């Protein structure tokens, strides 16, 4: 069996334009591609009759983040809590965590101010406009 390699992290959003603006403005990520997909094969693959999706692929320093808004829109849910089983987050690295934190727009939700863990790692968790968790690490 061929060994798999990581391709992207996918994040489902309700408002693709708002999500793209957040990730490009907050993290200075570049948009690699924007496209829509529909048809019977796609609907079968996502197991939703008649589903279509609008996608944006973003470059996160060689890693790819895929934002996708489905139609029909998925039912909303509570934002994920980091400590709950099944919670997923994206980790993005910055050179200066304090400068990143100070430069955040007022509307960006943070779980705390930048912290240094017992292992010496400097981290900060923020939420995107959809409530998805993003870990920002200083490297």
Task: Give the positions of each predicted feature.
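Haloarchaeal acidic low-complexity proteome signature biased toward cell-envelope/secretome components but also
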Residues: 1-5, 10, 19, 29, ...
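Vicinal oxygen chelate
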Residues: 2, 7-14, 54-63, 70, 77-139, ...
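A generic structural micro-feature
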Residues: 3, 47-50, 81-84
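Core segments of cupin and vicinal oxygen chelate
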Residues: 12-62
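Hydrophobic side chains in well-ordered alpha-helices
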Residues: 19-22, 100-104
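Short hydrophobic-acidic sequence motifs that mark active-site Asp/Glu residues
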Residues: 64-66, 133
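Acetyl-CoA-dependent GNAT
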Residues: 69-75, 138-139
């Amino acid at each position: 069996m061929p060994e798999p390699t990581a391709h992207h992290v996918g994040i489902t959003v309700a408002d693709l334009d708002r999500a793209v603006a957040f990730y490009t403005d907050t993290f200075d990520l570049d948009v690699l591609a924007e496209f829509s997909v529909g048809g019977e094969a796609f609907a079968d693959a996502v197991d939703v009759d008649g589903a279509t999706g609008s996608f944006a692929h973003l470059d996160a320093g060689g890693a790819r983040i895929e934002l996708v808004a489905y139609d029909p829109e998925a039912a909303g849910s509570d934002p994920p809590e980091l400590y709950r089983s099944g919670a997923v987050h994206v980790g993005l690295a910055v050179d200066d965590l304090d400068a990143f934190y100070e430069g955040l727009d007022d509307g960006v939700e943070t779980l705390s101010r930048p912290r240094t863990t017992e292992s010496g790692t400097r981290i900060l968790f923020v939420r995107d406009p959809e409530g998805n968790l993003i870990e920002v690490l200083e490297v």
